[in-house]
């Protein structure tokens, strides 16, 4: 595995189509193309737009956004695997199976996002993913992706 931080925000913007307020990965701590795994990080702050309504008196990061941050971390790895096709293809999050929410994520938490792909093909991929705050698992599940030509989205 490459040592941290191997990919910072500026390079992430070249690997993901997401932008503020929907970019939910701050940096990649490590990745291994041979093992098809990645570890990334999201620093959760009180300034996140979703905390305005979820919930003002007791802010908790919505579970669906924890899953989205996992999908984005996995998408970074797909972007690295695509390498030469990165500008032509896009990874789309298709779905999640076996999703479990185990621990609340609050302002000030550092969310560690890890994913390991069991399948990567020209059509997409499947990955096991886990989001943790410290040693506590916040959420986990099996993610599915499709790889599509960007031109087909026009």
Curated annotation (Swiss-Prot):
It catalyses: a (3R)-hydroxyacyl-[ACP] = a (2E)-enoyl-[ACP] + H2O. Keywords: Cytoplasm, Lipid A biosynthesis, Lipid biosynthesis, Lipid metabolism, Lyase. The active site is at 54. Belongs to the thioester dehydratase family. FabZ subfamily. It is found in: Cytoplasm. One of its GO terms (molecular function) is (3R)-hydroxyacyl-[acyl-carrier-protein] dehydratase activity. Coiled coil: none annotated. The lineage of its organism: Bacteria, Pseudomonadati, Chlamydiota, Chlamydiia, Chlamydiales. GO terms for biological process: fatty acid biosynthetic process; lipid A biosynthetic process. It is an enzyme of class 4 (lyase). Involved in unsaturated fatty acids biosynthesis. Catalyzes the dehydration of short chain beta-hydroxyacyl-ACPs and long chain saturated and unsaturated beta-hydroxyacyl-ACPs. This is 3-hydroxyacyl-[acyl-carrier-protein] dehydratase FabZ. The gene is fabZ. GO terms for cellular component: cytoplasm; membrane. It comes from the Bacteria. Its EC number is 4.2.1.59.
């Amino acid at each position: 595995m490459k040592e941290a931080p191997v990919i910072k925000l500026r390079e992430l913007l070249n690997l993901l189509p997401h932008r503020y307020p929907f970019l939910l990965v701050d940096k990649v701590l490590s990745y291994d193309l041979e093992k098809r795994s990645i570890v990334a990080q999201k620093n959760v702050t009180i300034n996140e737009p979703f905390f305005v309504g979820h919930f003002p008196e007791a802010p908790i990061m919505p579970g669906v956004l924890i899953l989205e941050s996992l999908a984005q971390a996995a998408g970074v790895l797909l972007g690295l695997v695509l390498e030469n096709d990165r500008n032509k293809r896009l990874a789309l999050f298709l779905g999640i199976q076996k999703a479990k929410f185990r621990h609340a994520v609050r302002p000030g938490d550092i969310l560690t996002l890890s994913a390991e792909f069991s399948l990567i093909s020209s059509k997409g991929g499947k990955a096991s993913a886990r989001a943790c705050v410290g040693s506590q698992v916040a959420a986990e599940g099996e993610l599915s992706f499709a790889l599509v030509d960007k031109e087909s989205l026009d």
